[in-house]
Amino acid sequence: LCNSIIAFIETNLLSSIAVPRIDTRPLKRLNDFKLEQKQLMRDLKVASYSVAEQQNKQALGIRLFLGLGRRNNELNRVIKALFDTTEQELVLYTPYFNFPAPLMRSLRRLLKQGKQVTIVVGDKTANDFYLPPSEPFSKIGALPYLYETILHKFVKTQKRHIDNGNLNVYLWKDESNSFHLKGICSDRTKHLLSGHNLNPRAWGLDIENGILIEDPEQTIMQAIDNEKQEILQHCRRLTG
């Protein structure tokens, strides 16, 4: 795993003029390597992590994925597959309730099929962009209210699934602390650790990484359950 990450950094990032050192002076300006920066973006859209040459004989499997852009995005495909192949339960952690359209369609489909869906999202006051009323207003400060509106609309339209227990939406809040968790757990056997926010920006614009843990024997499930309970201590369940 570490060798794959190091090889990717050395091959795709450090070798590029568009990734200058910032511990030397004078610092390069973007205009100095604008063409190289565009080429780097093109290269990263088709880049991927190397895989182990030897077949893994352990029960626990780990794979690395990279994603950038809407087309041919490996990480997005993995995320979509985790949603679509869930047979029993899907657990999601995201700081922003603003799913891209393909994932929202998959969520609704899972609920119609009677699958269990749990979503843990931060309260608007735990959002990175939240500005308390005492601070000057800015456009970026409106985002938490937008996400809150999208969340309440979703809860309202899916109320019957909330009432029958198939959908659990939890709002996290702990004093003035912020919430920036992200991750996916499918059927208690597949877990995605990622910086992907499950929002349109991460889906189509940002470069994102993900580590997919495949654990058919549920060897790490106890630790994941313990972590989930710690998180839910600061949550309230939305009822619509």
Predicted features and spans:
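PLD/PLD-like phosphodiesterase catalytic module centered on the HKD motif
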Residues: L1, T86-E89, Y96-G240
